[in-house]
Amino acid sequence: MKKQIGDRYEPKDVENKWISLWEKKKSFAPNSNARESFSIVIPPPNVTGSLHIGHALNHTIQDILVRIERKKGKSTLWLPGMDHAGIATQMVVERELAKESKKRTDFTREEFIHKVWEWKNHSGGMITKQQKLLGESVDWSRERFTLDEGLSKAVFKVFKSLYDEGLIYRGERIINWCPASQTAISDLEVEFRETKGKLYHIKYPIHGKKDQFLVVATTRPETMLGDVAVCANPEDERYTSLKDVVLDLPLTNRQIPLLFDSFVDKEFGSGLVKITPAHDANDFEAGQRLGLKPLLVMNPNGTMNENAGIYQGLDRFEARKKVLADLEAKGLIEKIEDHIHAVGHNSRGGAVIEPYLSTQWFVKIKPLADLAVQAVQSGQVEFIPKMWEKTFFEWMNNIRDWCISRQLWWGHRIPAYHCKKCKHFEVSETAVTVCTSCGSQEVEPDPDVLDTWFSSQLWPFSTLGWPDQTEDLKRYYPTSVLVTGFDIIFFWVSRMIMMGMKFMQAPPFHKVLIHGLVRDKDGKKFSKSVGNVIDPLVMMDKYGTDSFRFFLAATLPEGKDILFDESRLDGYRSFCNKIWNSSRFILMNLEESFVPIGITPDIEKDLEPMDQWILSRFNHCLEEYNKAHSKFHFYEMAAAIYEFIWGDFCDWYIELVKPRAYGKVSPRSAEVAKQVLSDVLIRALGLLHPFMPFLTEEVHSVFSDQYIVTTPFPESYPVASDSLGVQKLNLLQEIVTKIRVMRSENGVAPDRKCKAIVKSSDNLSSSTILENEVSLLQLARLESIRIDTLYEIQKTDSVSHFTKGEIVLPLEGLIDVAKEKTRLEKELQKSELEKEKLEIKLSNPGFLSKAAPEVVEKERDKLKTLIDKVEVLKKGIQNLAG
């Protein structure tokens, strides 16, 4: 063969080359001639985003699946795109304007939106370039954006349809309000943080009764200015005699009643709660039951309004301090306690969220949730691992109406229109400029935009052309599998199922593959504040993208988190180098005239035992790989191909076949060996390709002009796993491995050659040793090996059992027995001490309850390794003691 590969594997050069060639040749476009289809939609990253470790894991998993199905001949569509990310993008652009001492309100709405589009076109979408660097085999010609015209058409159609059915409505309710960004956010965007706060016990004077009070506990004293009642549990005997009591609301001139409702917890505080319907969700519901009118005391920007009296204009937290000071001055604070409680924060900006009474748009979610629940219960949608179904059902059964309006400028404008002249109101899929009731042109569109997740929930079918009945929609919907982290099951997965069942009468995907998070090696979540964030681009540049991808897949346990250990990346870089160097060895021993024809019947009839063995080992690898793939066990797939390539192929077969490859045997034997070497390498590259696309494509290009990305998925060889040749090589491998272990356990230096005696009367042992004596001497570093069933074992001999008998290594003269025994005893002492420490650690309930499960598992693995090591050391000492 004329083609060769370089002396060293240079990842960056290879990666840049193939990114360009794949795109130029449109290698990732769906095959329109294929009968079967396989489709995945990428969870659309934010247009503001850059590739983080979670993206890298999620996209690597998807790419592995897509590349496998493409090689299996299916028409694969992996559809990319980005989310307009309403609040996140608007905040980014506002920060850019702030650098010029400008703010959003300095512009008209249209001018500001124009600036956001400018930013999107110039600076947004950085993540697309980074996805290409990761080697993602998506069809970039189909890239979509949630504000595309087609997707917007789908959004407005869904809104109108749900509105017409009464499933979208406008109403006044308590919502999560962010005073910093001055917009509503959904329940799912509220991040509750455990906060060390205070519980204030405030005296509410009984009206007309001097020095008589009821004590109410609260964590938010500034909201008491909006109290309209105090409430007790009707079964609380402390207060049943006070049914007609009226209270003076402290710091105001208002009186409020004492009422009774079963939602009050008798055990919390004094058993009394203040009812503030405009600033608490539970109070709002209680207020509706009790017929109370809400009183809003806060402005949208978090300052107190005119209903707060003398506190008007103060920031909410300043108002809290002033209210407390005034209560203290009036002697109305009974006590203040330290109190740890969950405080809601905006998951994007971090501002403390206010429960706030506001008129917003909502989705009546229960009827839609029922559709999603039925889809999962009936098996139309399967969660993998199955444990996530329970989480899904729990959330769906406790779901509340979804607030979908946002007080932003960037996003899908709510398609509702209001006539200023006749007050007519209508919802329309297309813009309304003339009132359909009175003909007036004084029509105003609703000022709010939709929650970003409203458009994202339509992603699986809107990106395929819906509401138009396109060929893509017919062919690729439902999609085959959704790959996602557990953190967006509620944000996104559940809503997509609802919308798919509602508008497509079919779920958007058949399987939902849930993977864990990537954490640091101590099990902590990556966080900028902690300073442990890993940049995947840095890792890819340092170790090569293939090493990084393989690491993510190989360390991903089913449904659990990955603990990021950079040292393993170094190991997988070595794996890449091993493949490269082994490939170079094979190519250097192929003549220019060599043509890889595979294992044809003509080659098959002249296969030698070592050839039969490596073909059977490939079959075993393929079987394990396919079995793991069917269960989405990526770590098992990676382990199968890693062990085959590094162990069976490189460390065993290549070493065994070298004399034949060098031409030291008959020409026919050499020819067969070279066909086996090249064909097994090509098939192994085919299995490895989904994990390591760049390296495999580069090596494969030497053998074929067809890109490996589109070559057929490897098949098994027609060789029996129990043939005599395979049995002999399995036995040879066992003997060599046993001798290597014996040498190591007894401290025999690598450069010292031993004599080996095999005590076995088995014919297979005899023929294996006789036929492979040269290989045995070379691989086990032996001076000689012989079969002697009558050999009498000496005191200084090391003995090990194998399936057909015993192997004996005479150690006399090879090692200093006393010195080696002392070394092993010191090592044993050290290992037993480490083992004892780990056992104490793993029996500590505090560690077991606080540490991440992955960290506990890692420590258990360490203990198991130490237990095995201790046994080996004891055996070695015992051997030396005779």
Swiss-Prot record:
Motif ('KMSKS' region): 525-529
Main localisation: cytoplasm
GO molecular function, one term: ATP binding
GO biological process: valyl-tRNA aminoacylation
Domain of life of the organism encoding this protein: Bacteria
EC numbers on record: 6.1.1.9
Motif residue range(s): 'HIGH' region: 45-55
Residues binding ATP, per UniProt: K528
Function: Catalyzes the attachment of valine to tRNA(Val). As ValRS can inadvertently accommodate and process structurally similar amino acids such as threonine, to avoid such errors, it has a 'posttransfer' editing activity that hydrolyzes mischarged Thr-tRNA(Val) in a tRNA-dependent manner.
HAMAP family named in the record: Val_tRNA_synth_type1 (MF_02004)
Recorded family membership: Belongs to the class-I aminoacyl-tRNA synthetase family. ValS type 1 subfamily.
Entry protein name: Valine--tRNA ligase
